[in-house]
Amino acid sequence: MSDKVKRFLSHPLLSNRRLLLGIWIILSLAGMLKFHRSYNNFLIFKGVYWHTVNGTSLYAAYPTEYRDVNHYGPLFSLIIAPFAILPEWIGMLLWLLFLSGWLFAAIYWSGLRKSQQVYIYWFCGFTLLTALFMQQFNIAIAAIILSSFFLIDKEHEGWAAFFIVLGTLVKLYGIVGLAFFLFSRHKVRLILWLAVWSVILFLAPMAISSPDYIIGQYQEWYSSLVAKNTENIHSIAQNISLLGLVRRTTGCMNYSDLWLILPGMALFALPFLRFSQYKNLAFRETILASVLMFVILFSTGSESSGYIIALTGACIWYTVVPWKRGKWAVALMVFVFILSGMGNSDLIPKWIRHDYIQQYALRALPISILWLWLCYELCTKDYTPIEKVDADE
């Protein structure tokens, strides 16, 4: 990152993790402002537990309970269980604290230097609040992907496999953790643990239901995701991605997203051919940043709250490289913060927010530019450390 940003964030007050934790707790409390107006997502999540216990469909509509339908896997019933059995306001408050705490801890226990962690805490705070207002699990997905990477990097394949499988069986996004497989020093061990955790976590919801019910719900989940993907393509609230950006700005609807997804996957995979760079932590961390952005840019299910994932990736891209970022990188991060981070905020005039940002999925634009820049760097730059970095930074 630039020297000015580093000096600013190194101030004892701004870099105090206890203060930052306090701010994130306050943001969680602020998320409760939606309790008396719109906490529909929490009601859906709560319903996942109770419908599992009662043996009713997890993917049917229950208009007397909540709007919309659930799209999370049966395993989610166990994650939400401690919060679902409490009175609604207590359950929702603890849920928001749980989500914020999980991501805060994942960043804290990562391999990122303190200065990099502090940058993420500050930069992503506003986007975190947006996700908290929606009570969304995307906050935890960011934590799961981070944990998958750094646990593999620290040779804790067993726990890395746990988080990869957990994220996959809850919201599919976790499967991107498999992208870090090539960085593992114990690939056979990782494969074995993936198999073990897949069996354990697949069976786990049966503890509060039955085998036939859970197997049936996984089948329903697949069908619901296929149907949801079709709906997302034309939804204003969904597909806030590179796919949606291209579709809405061009006005062309009669083509397959594979025309964008396949080149995107090729560009994403190309840096993995640079085997000589694997030894450089900055290279591997930039791959992590690419994964965090790719999962949002190339998913029709990308929604406003998902940008906590992409912005975490943007912060990692900006801070981990061994060279100093220039003015263009700083300008791009400002663009990311304003449009991708605040694009859904009431601080943006309503007519701009609704008629342009939302209508054309413009929140994806800065992240798309940044990701393309990132891919270019991954394919051309040398990530060998050029200076010794203080371990306390």
Residue spans of the language-model regions?
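Aromatic-enriched
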Residues: Y318-E393
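Hydrophobic/aromatic-rich transmembrane helices and adjacent perimembrane loops
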Residues: E303-Y318, A364-P366
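Primarily membrane-embedded glycan-assembly and transfer machineries that use lipid-linked glycans
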Residues: S2-W159, S184-S304, T384-V389
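A cytosolic-side transmembrane-helix exit/cap motif
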Residues: I141-A142, A161, D212-Q219, S304-T312, ...
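Membrane-embedded alpha-helical segments of transport systems
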Residues: L169-L172, I200-A204, L339
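Transmembrane helices and adjacent periplasmic/lumenal helix-loop junctions
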Residues: I164-L182, S299-I309
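Hydrophobic transmembrane alpha-helices
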Residues: F104-Y108, I145-K154, V176, F180-S184, ...
